[in-house]
Amino acid sequence: MNGPSSAAPFKRLEGKVAIITGGASGIGAMAVELFHENGAKVVIADVQDKLGEDLADKLGQDVCYIHCDISNEDEVINLVDTAVSKFGKLDIMYNNAGILDRSFGSILDTPKSDLERLINVNTIGGFLGAKHAARVMVPQQKGCILFTASACTEIAGLGSPAYTISKYGILGLVKCLAAELGQYGIRVNCVSPYGLATGMSMKGGVDPALIESSMSQMGNLKGEFLKTDGIANAALYLASDESSYVSGQNLVVDGGFSVVNPTVMRAYGLIK
């Protein structure tokens, strides 16, 4: 009879250094904890200083917080340079930070300023993060650049026109950078979530259980709720050596929603 194993649990990011933008809350905070649990030294980048500092204090000396507005190139430069100065290198850049519309509206009701605000953070912020991560990864001849996009890039109707444009830009960036940076051993991918309850989606005091129930009813995969750990685990896979030959890909985490049109099956009584 075999006794209990004394082997330490396998840590998928052992020895790696990661920056996670938008890491103080939501998907980013879950990714910070998961990457740290798997052996990475993590730099949390956010503008939510109290949340970011509290999370870094909770996780200990291998995690630190740096204030960073990702739409400000000087702050992104400081973020990357400080991470390398503190931990000696940068292996993973997870460009997760993003914002939503003020309201889910028609293009007829969307002011130009809302589109500019979303592109400035969601698209340009990701561009700057990737640019300066690549600056330090190219000499290393190795690295992983990740983004959080959205399932609204796979099927219409999940996001507003302005939000969808800002996330489509990320898909173009992923493909372009995968082509350019592959010669340096740098992989570039993104994760595209279906709707889920995060601090960003719950602004205004919306009950997270209500969001989960609503998204589940609209979703394709029944009996499961998408939570932040589902996206963080997808990012962990793409950041780890388990995906060492995966680049230029959009990992859609939506329970099959974007590939299903149930109209015909419903007409024939095959599904409810």
Curated annotation (Swiss-Prot):
Q: Does the keyword Oxidoreductase apply?
A: yes
* PROSITE patterns tied to this protein: ADH_SHORT (PS00061)
Q: Please provide an example of a Pfam family that matches this protein in its UniProt record.
A: adh_short_C2
Which transformation does this protein catalyse, written as a reaction? Answer: 21-O-acetyl-isomeliandiol + A = (21S)-21-acetoxyl-apo-melianone + AH2
Going by the UniProt record, its keywords in alphabetical order are: Oxidoreductase
Recorded superkingdom: Eukaryota
- Tissue expression notes: Expressed in maturing fruits and in juice vesicles.
Ribonucleoprotein in keyword set: no
Q: Which residues form the active site?
A: 150 (proton donor), 163 (proton acceptor), 167 (proton donor/acceptor)
GO molecular function terms here?
oxidoreductase activity
Q: What is its EC number?
A: 1.1.1.-
Per the record, the pathway is: Secondary metabolite biosynthesis; terpenoid biosynthesis
Q: What does this protein do?
A: Oxidoreductase involved in the biosynthesis of limonoids triterpene natural products such as limonin, a compound with insecticidal activity responsible for the bitter taste in citrus. Catalyzes the oxidation of 21-O-acetyl-isomeliandiol to (21S)-21-acetoxyl-apo-melianone.
What family is this protein classified in? Belongs to the short-chain dehydrogenases/reductases (SDR) family.
User: Which PANTHER family does the record cross-reference, listed alphabetically?
Assistant: 3-OXOACYL-(ACYL-CARRIER-PROTEIN) REDUCTASE (AFU_ORTHOLOGUE AFUA_6G11210), TROPINONE REDUCTASE-LIKE 2
What this protein is called in its record is (21S)-21-acetoxyl-apo-melianone synthase SDR
Which organism does this sequence originate in? Citrus sinensis (Sweet orange)
Gene label: SDR
